[in-house]
């Protein structure tokens, strides 16, 4: 039979392998390769020197790189019996299968006659690149030798010659953890990440995959570092660290004390440096460092917010702004140093705003919603806890009126605020004496108005632990509340960071450990994460600094 060639469809046939439970399975080639991009390579038998050194090990070592180029499955076909194959099948990136009779090798036309040596029919050394069963690359060696480098070069060349729209469609399916390898492959592939059509396509596919897996993705700050994490919402939730986010080279890595999210952009406040802050798009790997104005205010504290002026219908073209509020802890003093400043990305200038507040912003963190920022607040000279919210409008650069919360928090009652995918405001009301937990969500919200609906009420003996939370968010689709927390020992001392998962519908709570922090005073922070295609503008003379979106943890 003529050897298989480019353009042919790979024939079907039966092959065998041992599964993870060491059970022998016999399946068809088509069941493994249909609808996928697959590398099928063959060796004459287990452990001949040429195959072991130049062929099998090469595919094992390059498996992740090949998969970053869009390969879904790597299959090694040998003429040995399946029991011999188990000896070299420990690697999870390559599937080792057996064609002991040589029937499938003969269907491919790649048999090697060695009957004169008493070995019967064996396979030539070969490698095929299949796309939905169709052969697009063939590489056949002699005596078992087959160049992995040549196949990888042909694979990359073949993909790079594809039309742009088709190439974008293929690479947009590559999982995020392989994206750094993709970007480093060639200039053309790296350039795709600056294309609006590609980034939107990739984000859409990533979000669809996340929904299918019932996974919630979030930004977590702990120990002054920032991580991308995912929570699998199953019967028993689990948490996975997807990567450590980094906006600088390792040699320059800084500690981050606060993170503020706005439509996929992060505003990062440095732990040990008041002279600058950084705005960061983790998805595009872009940063912009901004010098701050020094303020002599020993007893003051600073609150930051990141937002947009809504002057453009195209979100990717809107220019961000930063608000910094400097206020004093003593809310009953008449002579309080106050300063409201706004930074404009286009002009690269800080401007002082003329604000005479009759309110006091209670929450340390603001919430981004449709380009504006909302805080928990109260009347400036009133007693009590948070009982209102107030909005800063980044388009008009002014505050709106105080908007009442649907409850009043006094004494052993507490209120915390968050947002739902930056579309709604949520308020968590905690009553320590009655062991009640209420979650409210806005049905309408803008600068001047807010209406609320109760999302759920929950009785919980864990309330005393939840009271110490700093941040939370709600995942409406999976019907859970995600809360940052710290655990305590029997003496009441802080021990380790954790994530609390509250299911209001099932009336249950799970705790997921994050580990013991190096600094017990650094409270973990959580916020939902959705990738952004917004390009970060640089100030005049500046240059966009691009890094990989995250390092695999």
From Swiss-Prot:
InterPro entries: F-box-assoc_dom_typ1, F-box-assoc_interact_dom, F-box-like_dom_sf, F-box_dom, Gal_Oxase/kelch_b-propeller, PRX5-like, Redoxin, Thioredoxin-like_sf. The active site is at 51 (cysteine sulfenic acid (-soh) intermediate). NCBIfam families: F_box_assoc_1. It comes from Arabidopsis thaliana. GO terms for molecular function: thioredoxin peroxidase activity. The active site is a conserved redox-active cysteine residue, the peroxidatic cysteine (C(P)), which makes the nucleophilic attack on the peroxide substrate. The peroxide oxidizes the C(P)-SH to cysteine sulfenic acid (C(P)-SOH), which then reacts with another cysteine residue, the resolving cysteine (C(R)), to form a disulfide bridge. The disulfide is subsequently reduced by an appropriate electron donor to complete the catalytic cycle. In this 1-Cys peroxiredoxin, no C(R) is present and C(P) instead forms a disulfide with a cysteine from another protein or with a small thiol molecule. Its EC number is 1.11.1.25. Monomer. GO terms for biological process: cellular response to oxidative stress. Residues 4-160 form the Thioredoxin domain. It comes from the Eukaryota. This is Peroxiredoxin-2A. It catalyses: [glutaredoxin]-dithiol + a hydroperoxide = [glutaredoxin]-disulfide + an alcohol + H2O. The lineage of its organism: Eukaryota, Viridiplantae, Streptophyta, Embryophyta, Tracheophyta. Thiol-specific peroxidase that catalyzes the reduction of hydrogen peroxide and organic hydroperoxides to water and alcohols, respectively. Plays a role in cell protection against oxidative stress by detoxifying peroxides. May be involved in intracellular redox signaling. Pfam families: F-box, FBA_1, Redoxin. It is an enzyme of class 1 (oxidoreductase). Keywords: Antioxidant, Oxidoreductase, Peroxidase, Redox-active center, Ubl conjugation pathway. SMART domains: FBOX. Belongs to the peroxiredoxin family. Prx5 subfamily. Residues 156-201 form the F-box domain.
């Amino acid at each position: 039979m003529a050897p298989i060639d480019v353009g042919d469809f790979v024939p079907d046939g039966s092959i065998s392998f041992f599964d993870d439970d060491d059970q022998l399975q016999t399946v068809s080639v088509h069941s493994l390769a249909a609808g996928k991009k697959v590398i099928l390579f063959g060796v004459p038998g287990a452990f001949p020197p040429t195959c072991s050194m130049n062929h099998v090990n090469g595919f094992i070592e390059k498996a992740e790189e090949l998969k970053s180029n869009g390969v879904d499955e790597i299959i090694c076909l040998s003429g040995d019996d399946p029991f011999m194959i188990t000896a070299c099948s420990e690697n999870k990136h390559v599937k080792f299968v057996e064609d002991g009779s040589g029937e499938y090798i003969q269907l491919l036309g790649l048999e090697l006659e060695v009957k004169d040596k008493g070995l019967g029919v064996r396979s030539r050394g070969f490698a095929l690149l299949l796309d939905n069963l169709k052969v697009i690359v063939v590489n056949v060696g002699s005596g078992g030798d087959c160049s992995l480098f040549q196949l990888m070069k042909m694979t990359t060349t073949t993909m790079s010659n594809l039309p742009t729209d088709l190439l974008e469609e293929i690479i947009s399916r590559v999982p995020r953890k392989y994206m750094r390898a993709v970007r480093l492959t060639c200039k053309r592939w790296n350039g795709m990440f600056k294309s609006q059509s590609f980034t939107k396509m990739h984000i859409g596919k990533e979000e669809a995959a996340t929904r299918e897996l019932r996974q919630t993705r979030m930004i977590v700050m702990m120990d002054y570092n920032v991580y991308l994490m995912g929570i699998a919402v199953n019967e028993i939730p689990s948490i996975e660290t997807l990567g450590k986010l980094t906006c600088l080279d390792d040699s320059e890595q800084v500690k981050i004390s606060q993170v503020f999210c706005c439509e996929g952009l992060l505003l990062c406040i440095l732990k040990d440096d008041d002279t600058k802050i950084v705005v960061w798009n983790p998805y595009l790997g872009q940063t912009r460092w901004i010098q701050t104005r020094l303020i002599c205010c020993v007893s003051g504290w600073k609150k930051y917010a990141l937002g947009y002026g809504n002057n453009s219908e195209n979100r990717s073209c809107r220019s961000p702004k930063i608000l910094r509020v400097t206020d004093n802890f003593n809310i009953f003093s008449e002579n309080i140093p106050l300063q409201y400043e706004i930074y404009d990305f286009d002009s690269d200038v800080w401007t002082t705003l003329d604000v005479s507040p009759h309110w006091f912003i209670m929450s340390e963190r603001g919430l981004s919603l449709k380009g504006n920022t909302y805080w928990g607040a109260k009347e400036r000279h009133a007693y009590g806890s948070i009982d209102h919210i107030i909005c800063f409008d980044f388009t008009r650069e002014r505050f709106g009126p105080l908007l009442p919360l649907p409850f009043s928090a006094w004494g052993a009652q507490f209120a915390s605020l968050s947002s739902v995918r930056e579309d709604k405001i949520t308020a968590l009301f905690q009553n320590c004496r009655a062991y009640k937990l209420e979650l409210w969500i806005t049905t309408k919200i803008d600068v001047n108005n807010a209406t609320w609906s109760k999302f759920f009420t929950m009785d919980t003996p864990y309330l005393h632990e939840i009271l110490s939370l700093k941040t939370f968010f709600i995942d409406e689709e999976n019907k859970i509340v995600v809360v940052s927390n710290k655990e305590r020992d029997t003496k009441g001392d802080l021990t380790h960071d954790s994530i609390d998962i509250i299911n209001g519908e099932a009336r249950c709570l799970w705790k997921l450990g994050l580990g013991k922090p190096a600094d017990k005073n650094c409270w973990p922070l959580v916020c939902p994460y959705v990738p952004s295609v917004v390009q970060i503008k640089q100030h005049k003379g500046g240059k966009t600094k691009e890094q990989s979106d995250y390092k695999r943890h």
